[in-house]
C-alpha cells in the first residue's frame, strides 16, 4: 500500500479553495470517492490524517476546505466566526459542497458512479 496525497486547488464563486486529496497508489482501477468534512477548525492536520486513513480503505478521499485558501484556526472564537459566516450564506454552503464534489467526481481515479 502506498498512500499518495496532493493539495488540490479549486475555485468556487471566485474564491480559491485548497482541498487535500489522498489515494492508494497501488490500486490502478477507479475507486469510490468520499468527501471528508472538517470540524469547525478547518482542514487541519487531524482532518488530513483522517483523509489518508479513508484512502487506506480503498477510497479516493478529499478533505474539504470550507473556508477558502486553506484557512485553519486555533481558538473557538475564530472557529465560530468563520463557521457562522459560512452557515449564514446558504448559497455558499451549496456551491462549496458542489465544488468539492466536482473535484472528486472529475478526478481520473474516481469511479464517479460511487461517490
Each PLM stretch: what is its role?
Residues 1-3:
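Short solvent-exposed loop/turn micro-motifs enriched in small/polar/acidic residues
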Residues 111-115:
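Short, intrinsically disordered, charge-balanced linker/junction segments flanking boundaries
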Amino acid at each position: 500500500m502506498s498512500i499518495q496525497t496532493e493539495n488540490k486547488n479549486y475555485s468556487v464563486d471566485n474564491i480559491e479553495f485548497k482541498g487535500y486529496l489522498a489515494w492508494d497508489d497501488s490500486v490502478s482501477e477507479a475507486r469510490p470517492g468520499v468527501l471528508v468534512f472538517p470540524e469547525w477548525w478547518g482542514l487541519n492536520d487531524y482532518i488530513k490524517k483522517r483523509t489518508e486513513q479513508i484512502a487506506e480503505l480503498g477510497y479516493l478521499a478529499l478533505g474539504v476546505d470550507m473556508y477558502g485558501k486553506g484557512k485553519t484556526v486555533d481558538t473557538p472564537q475564530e472557529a465560530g466566526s468563520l463557521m457562522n459566516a459560512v452557515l449564514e450564506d446558504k448559497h455558499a454552503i451549496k456551491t462549496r459542497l458542489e465544488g468539492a464534489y466536482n473535484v472528486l467526481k472529475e478526478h481520473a481515479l474516481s469511479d464517479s458512479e460511487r461517490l
